[in-house]
Amino acid sequence: MTTAALGLALRAAGHNFKIAIVHFMKIWDYGEVKTLKRLGIDLFRYGTTELIDPENPSPVDFEQAKLAMEKAEELVREGAYDIVILDEITVAIGFNLISLQGVVDLLENKPDNLELILTGRTCPEALIERADLVSRIDEIKHPYQKGLQARKGIEF
């Protein structure tokens, strides 16, 4: 998930790694965005301020996901980064905004010296099979379950 990927980015930034993050479906002004910019981590953010209807994504949702995927392919191809994080990309696959095969191709053609990190709530088996490391963070209990709103500095 995003939290673990950002922890890795923080650690790598401490060792002067060059890091890029492509946010699929995330353009809100989260607190971590401000910190990442201060650390010199390059952010490429795509999406809208509207929630996506997984059953009926809008044409804008498809266009934004396409642009995010094109940026991901460019970053991997150019090889200028040590780490590229594709945040919420597996959710974009699950919503059928981008093709699973396109992400598989990206994994199979990445340079050996690039750490390519994918995040999202679900992960297709085809990606798990090709990954070197797979982690799962399961929500057991959350304040949302009590109807509490997201809190500045905690959830965003």
Where do the PLM segments sit?
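Conserved P-loop
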Residues: M1-R77
